[in-house]
Amino acid sequence: MIVTYNWLKEFVDFDLSPQELSDLLTMLGLEVEGVRHVGGGLDEVVVAVVEERSQHPNADKLSLCRVNNGKETLAIVCGAQNFKAGDKVALAQIGAVLPGDFKIKRSKIRGEESCGMLCSEKELGLAAESEGIIILPTDLPLGVPVFDALGLKDTIFEIGLTPNRADCLSVVGIAREIAAKLGTTVKYARPSVKESVVPISERAQVIVEDSDLCPRYTARYIAGCSIGPSPAWLVRRLEAVGMRSINNVVDVTNYVLMEYGHPLHAFDADLLAGGKIVVRRAAAGERFTTLDGQERVLTESDLTIRDGEKGVALAGIMGGENSEIRQETSNILLESAYFNPSAIRRTSKRLGLHTESSHRFERGADVDILVTALDRAASLIAELAGGRVATGTIDVYPRPLPRRTVRFRVDQCNRLLGIQLTADEMAAIFNRLEFKVNVVEPELFDIDVPSCRVDIEREIDLVEEVARLNGYNNIPVTMPKARVFSDRPTRHQRLEKQLRNVMVGQGFSEVITFSFMAPGILDKLLLAHDDPRRSVVRLRNPLVEEQSVMRTTLLPGLLDVAARNINYRMLTLRLFELRRVYLPAEGQELPREPLHLAGIMTGVRYREGWNQERHQVDFYDVKGVIEHILDEFAIGSVVFVQDRLDPYFHPGKACSILCGNELLGSFGELHPDIHDNFGIDQSVYYLDLDFEKLAMVSSDNVAIKPPSRFPDTFRDIAMLIKDETPASTIVECISGLRIREVECAEIFDHYKGSHVPEGFKSIAVRIRYRSHERTLVDNEVTPLHQRIVDTLVKKLAVTIR
């Protein structure tokens, strides 16, 4: 936002220097990013009169001039052609330094002496471009600095506004901030419109078909205008804020835009079919040519302004070529409307068309200032273009927008800011900001927010206003205060930490992957079409299709991480993730979010070394990880079975984990097709445990059994057992006898081959016996051992070898 010092002083009285004003604005949160002084240091550029002009003897395009500055007559060589004898001009005398650090010196030009320079607006920094030198009003006194004589000395501030401060996109808005800080009032211009006897209802009609996108539309009709150049004061003021002059009518709309911050648009009323304005959405594929000469293809989401036959403007963004103000324009329909910010933002972004108008509408305009801005523009057009304003204003406002009221607590504000202001002091701040304070209780307010402050929505926004107006530099330095909670972690939290420690202790690294996945990735996992994990939760606004649904398994994320690392030649990996998955819940809108532990192992078992053989990890490595977890959680009576397995496991190389009737999880080698689907060319082993079920069956009380100080003894049993019988059932059968003297039973040999019948396998079990009371002797161990043998033969139909 660009604003000038003098323009601000028209709306608020202050005695601050430009530098002091710059500091004040910055402390208010309106950061001044640049300051430019106009006319400063140009006192040597004075008003002079051309007494004589003649042709340069040595150059066709140069003139010899005799110029009087009120003290003396000087010889000047000039190349401009737009002046004559008797004109008053801006004379840069010897020693003057013009913008761009251009110093005026006595010189000879084509053999003729020149004691100064006649200046153009561009050379004085008054315009970006100019033709010829500046011709001054005839009533200006000679010898007076030009900028003093014209009242052009000014300071231009370039202010960087945050997107929420739409109220400061105007001179009035910034003046309101200055007045609030200084405790003074804004001198609002109350436009007075001299109306003709012709009612506007006889000249124009407005129909709003979509009041959601255009809640309010106002208009005035001005007849008999003469289109021409704007007066110098208006041109210079627009140029000071970075706008170029077009004609007196368009310049007025731009002037009011910068003054009040509300966009206006002027239509050539004679080009509006039927004298009608219709506000409605565009038709899909509709083509419309805007003022910049570009043809735009519109959609049904774009709001247009139409007459009785065609589109004449892209609402809130840019007018149309077919209704613009021309040199021949006589009658004008002036628009002042409020458009839905989201609709303007969407259309502007889609078309790549950003204008001063759309910049303000998409941030939120002031719906209450429409008529004020409209009347201000109408009175200026009548003054500068000689128009006659029709009686009355069209104001279509079927459903007034609701007012915002925000509850405010004085003690909460003091606590958050670390200050000690009274309720009266805070109320005074809000009153200076033109907020209405309704006192509910001595330290409880209901604040009515002005329509211009679209950024005020919650109590914390009001707290910020107190901080700004009271001064950030007035907030005392205090140590931060926070409540310290000493609650102990819950059982689940302790178990989560324990599980992470177990995994890290076994050489795993924790990874964190996205909670989103691509729906098509479930096909890569070979899941059946009726698998519940295909019932995914879809995101309403995904960034990309690859992250458009919530994950129902942790496996894809781990495989993506593994594939990426393997591509970088990190061939040995142990990774785990303890995170939630999102599974459908029958009869409920929201999914279940169980916590799962998933891990993968691939590569070699041990790091390479001269004393280590290079063995690849296998099924028993991942099984060992599972057993270690079960031991840490004190979970007994676990059975490993080769059923209830997911299709992404390799057949015959995976197990499910059962504890009673609860399925705790599964583990094993992944199917070769899974490797191919994820671009992995080595075996990967996977484990998946349901943390909630682990926690449910785990025990917090672990029985401590002191070691026996007596020696053990062992006996071996070699037996034949059917192939389909898991070897683990032998150990389970022995444990089920609950013989106190049996310390452990371990399988130490597994054999299939010669001397073993087809359909059988040879298993050898070593049973260790030990007593805590004495050393066991053979006649005590033998009957115990025989009991075990008999039970195995009877229950498992084994053949003792």
Swiss-Prot record:
Residues 708-801 form the FDX-ACB domain. It is an enzyme of class 6 (ligase). One of its GO terms (molecular function) is magnesium ion binding. The keyword Oxidoreductase does not apply. The keyword Amino-acid biosynthesis does not apply. Residues 39-147 form the tRNA-binding domain. This is Phenylalanine--tRNA ligase beta subunit.
